[in-house]
Amino acid sequence: MKTLTPPRVTDTTLRDGSHAMRHQFTREQVRAIVAALDEAGVPVIEVTHGDGLAGSSIQYGFSATSELELIEEAAKTAKRAKIAALLLPGIGTRRELSAAIERGIKVVRIATQCTEADISEQHFGMAKEMGLETVGFLMMAHMRPPEFLAEQAALMESYGADCVYIVDSAGAMLPDDVRRRVAALKERLSIQVGFHAHNNLGLAIGNTLAAIEEGADQVDGCLRGLGAGAGNAPTELIAAVLDKLGINPGLDVFKLMDAAEYIVAPIMPYQPIPDRDAITIGYAGVYSTFLLHARHIAAEFGLDPREILVELGRRQAVAGQEDWILDVALDILRRKRAAEGAGDAREPAAAERSAD
């Protein structure tokens, strides 16, 4: 077995968990969660809207409390931990990043689709100019082979990234998928490599462990697994596993368990689990945001939304391509009618309504 080293753990309850909370975190909740994580030895705590700085919008969902207020509360509360923020090119700008720095962030995590690292050059540049630690996120990383991801990660390194993450946004990877991708980045880069898991196939902890076994320097978790889809790797479970492996980076396992049980669990609207919908997202390999749209259109056409999602995954649809859902539904309907001997399917009137 390889010699393992303790990874740095970033808790993203207050960012990825914001999706599950519908972006309704309060200052009081942030204060309580940050205090507990800080006391338990978590070195980095991410705090923003689920879609990053400036994510609060009609498109992504409005925050109940300004993310800048939440960041400020987190920075005031943390005694040792660094506060991090997520930034997506095309959503967050220099203005929001500057404002977040004024409120106390020390780390920015810059996320792009795994095929679009080149759009992050300006963002890494300005973040380094502002004195931040910079982390790159290659989202939907299951969609491209390891060698391609290594090339994209190398671009981020050249722009100034201090670490690049393999991000399993859809929770679609198997442990060997993770190993090969992390290994490719470790071989190519001279900077740190990270891994961010989702639990749609029930593999968040197993995949995180696979990443650590391949040398991942940083990993992510959320208390109680609170996150998008079926959630993330639970921070308290990561701590327990690392402790059993003898590579605990200084986390208090019991305090994290208590934080999950007594602080986060009571405010959760639901417990993220790999239910039918989450499994479908992981199996199909698509963003969880596609789910409601697929359900709506499937109901109009009398289709199973899972058929639509699986086909979207086959076509490698990514966020922003929700308009594909209608086309995919019509294609499936045509194929079914042709198979039934109906010949060319006429587009139902519902198609016109959905396209409006």
Curated annotation (Swiss-Prot):
PROSITE patterns listed in its UniProt record: PYR_CT (PS50991)
Biological process per Gene Ontology, one example term: L-leucine biosynthetic process
Catalytic activity: (S)-4-hydroxy-2-oxopentanoate = acetaldehyde + pyruvate
Keyword Manganese: yes
InterPro entries recorded: 2-IPM_HCS-like, 4OH_2_O-val_aldolase, Aldolase_TIM, DmpG_comm, DRE_TIM_HOA, PYR_CT
Segments forming domain Pyruvate carboxyltransferase: 7-257
Residues marked Transition state stabilizer (site): 15
EC number(s) stated in the UniProt entry for this protein: 4.1.3.39
Enzyme class: lyase
Protein name: 4-hydroxy-2-oxovalerate aldolase
